[in-house]
Amino acid sequence: MVHSKSYLGSLALLVAAATGKEMQPNAQVAAELYDSGVIHDQIMENKISQWTRARELGLYNADRYPELGYTACVNGWIEAIPGDRNNTFRCNNIDLYHFLSHAALGDELAEGSSSWGWTSDDGREFVAIGQYQGTAFVEIGSDGRMTYLGRLPAYSLPSFWREIRTYQHYIVIGSEALNHGIQIFDLHKLLDIDPASPVEFTQDDLTSWTRQLLPLGRAHNVVVNEELGYFAAVGGQPRGDPICNSGLNFFDITNPADPISLGCAAGDGYVHDAQCLVYHGPDTRYEGRDICYSYNEDTLTIYDVTDKANVTNIISRISYEGASYTHQGWLLDVTNQEFLVLDDELDELSGAGEASDGFPVTFIWDIRDLENPRQTGSYKSSVRAIDHNQYVIDGLVYQSNYGAGMRVFDLTSIPSDPTGAGVCEVAWIDIYPEDDGLEGGGIIEFLGTWSSYAYFKSGYIFINTIERGAFTVRLTGSECPPTPVCNADNCLRAFRATSIPGRLEESQEFCATYTNSPFHDASVLPEYARRGCSGDAVARASSACACLPTATAAP
C-alpha cells in the first residue's frame, strides 16, 4: 500500500481538531493542503503509482480475462469458470450476465473509468464506457449481453480520468487530459451500427467541442442539469485560474451543437463533483431555485446557482470529523431533498475518523435546512476497501468500492432514523478476487471498480472496472440479510470448545480461510467439525464460522 507521509501527517492534525460530527473547515489546513492542490495531486500520483505497479504485475493482461457468460450467485459465489479463482467472485443477491475485457471493447491499454447509460425512445439500452484512450459504446440486449458498437477516441493525450454524463440523447465527456476539452456526441449515431463492423468515430462526428474557460482543456468531472439544459465542467486546471478557480464552469447546452458559456461559480475554489438540480424540499426559502450540492475536497458546499453570470452564492459550507478528501455524494430523493449521502475517498487510506479500521464509511447528511446541514450518522461496508462513486435509485444506493466491487445498500430507513443504524448492505459483487484472502476481505488501494450505472428499466446494471473490463449484472433480491442464529448446538460447541486449549483460535484461523474460498466440501473441514456438524456439514460449518467472535489482531 502506498502512503504519503506528507499529507497523512497533516490530515492527522485536521482530524485532531474535530469537535463534532459536522464542523467548520480548518482554514489553515485547507489553504495548505486543499486549496493548493497538494492533496489532490498526491492522490493522483498515488493512483498512477498503483496502476503502474498493477500493470507491471500483469493485472492488465487481457488474456487473464476471457469473456464470461451468465452465472448465478450460488452460496455467496459466482463461479464463472469452474475451478478458476481468478474468475470467481464473491456475491450476494446479484447474478452475472456478461463480461467483456477492455481489449474486447477496443482499448488494449484498459484503464476503465466513468460510465453512463442511455435508453433510446424505443427502449434500447446503451452504455458509454470511459477508457484510457477514449470512450467505447455497447448495447445491452434483452439477455443482458453486451454488443460492442465502436468507440470515440479522445483526440488528445490518453488519460486515466474520463467522466461521462448524458443530456437527452447526447453524451458529455470531460477528461484530465491536456487539451481534451468537453466532447459532446449524439448517441443516435449508435442506432444503426452493424455490430459486425464496429465504428471508430472521427472528430467530425462530434456534435460539438468546447474548452471555453478551461485554460488547459482539462476538467476532472462534468455535471448535467437536464431539466434546466446546462452542464458544468468542474475541477478545471490550473488551480487559481482567475475566472473559474477550478469551480463550477457553466454551459448552456439547449443547443448541443453550440454550447454557450454562462459563467462560473468560483468562490469556493476546486469542485471535485456535484449534483445540480431544481430544489424541491422542506426549506421553502429555496423552492424552485437551482441548487448544486458540491463535494469540494474538504467540504460539502451547497450553492444557489440560479444566477450563473460569474457570481458565487454559497448557501452553506461545512466539513466533518475525519474529512480527508470529500469526493462525491447523492441525494436520497430528488423530489424531496431532505438527506444526502457522501463518500470520502481518502479516509480509509489515511486511517481518519470512523474509517480508521479500513472499512468504507458513508456519511449521512440532514439537509432539511440548506443553510445548516447536519451530519447525523454513517454506515459502513463489510469489506475493507476505498469507497468511490455512488448513486441512489428508489431507496437503494449503488456504490463502487474499488477492490470490494459494487455494493448495494438499503437507505429507506434514513428519514426515520438518520443515524444510519437501520441501513443494511443488501447486495454486492466483488469483481476483484485478487484481494479476497486479505484481512478484512480486501485491500485499501485504488484498484477494481470505478463506476456503475443502475438506471436501466430492464434491471441490468453496468459496472466498469479499471483493469479487467465491463460487467453486466442484475439484482435477484434486495432484502436485508438475516442476523445469524447462533444456537449452541454440537457444531458450534466443537468450534468453540473451551475445554480444549487453542480450539477457538484454531477455528478462527480455519474460518478465515474457509469463508474466503468458494470451493467447499466436507473434506476440507477439520476432524472436530466433521464429527460435530452432522447432516449438511458444509452449511453447518459455515453457520458456525459466522457465529465465532472476531479474532484479535496480533500486536
Predicted segments — roles?
Residues 19-483:
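Feature marking well-ordered beta-strand scaffolds used for ligand recognition
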Residues 2-3, 186, 455, 537:
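Helix N-cap and loop-to-helix transition residues
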Residues 1-22, 555:
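Fungal secretory targeting signals
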Residues 14-17, 397, 536:
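Short acidic, glycine/proline-enriched loop segments that cap or flank alpha-helices
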Residues 19-75, 481-555:
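Fungal extracellular Ser/Thr-rich, low-complexity intrinsically disordered regions
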Residues 6-13, 31, 204, 424, ...:
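Intrinsic-disorder/low-complexity peptide segments enriched for small residues
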